[in-house]
């Protein structure tokens, strides 16, 4: 039987957070550090697949620490060059609803960082 530590260390952790370019930089730094922490704990990061603000920072933090990143993004956001193509996996879906559904389906745990109405709507 696997140990609890080995099970926990293989989790996919979804992070919901702001993608606004106007959010206070202290939150962007917080997201980056969380991404690093997820990766150094041998977990995988799941995000909404964007490259800016907190969403981009959490992924950069995970990658900088050698972690795996998985993004899920609607085609409409890919079309406006919002996608983080540096993700190890980038799943493109049709709608925001499909994005939420896939993120919740593939993730084992969830973290919510500061954000606005879009972050709140994730729940």
What are these regions (language model features)?
Residues 98-123:
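Active-site/ligand-binding-proximal alpha/beta "capping" segment
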Residues 26, 57, 81-83, 102, ...:
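Short, well-ordered secondary-structure micro-motifs
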Residues 8, 85, 105:
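Structured loop/turn residues at beta-strand edges in well-structured enzyme cores
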Residues 22, 26, 83, 94, ...:
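N-terminal alpha/beta PP-like core and its mobile active-site loop of ThDP/TPP-dependent enzymes
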Residues 42, 87-88, 107:
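Short, well-ordered alpha-helix to beta-strand connector turns
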Residues 47-96:
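Glycine-rich, small/polar surface segments that engage phosphate groups of diverse ligands
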Residues 18-21, 51, 75-77, 109, ...:
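Short glycine-rich anion-binding loops that position phosphate/pyrophosphate groups of nucleotides
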Residues 2-68:
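Glycine-rich beta-alpha loop segments
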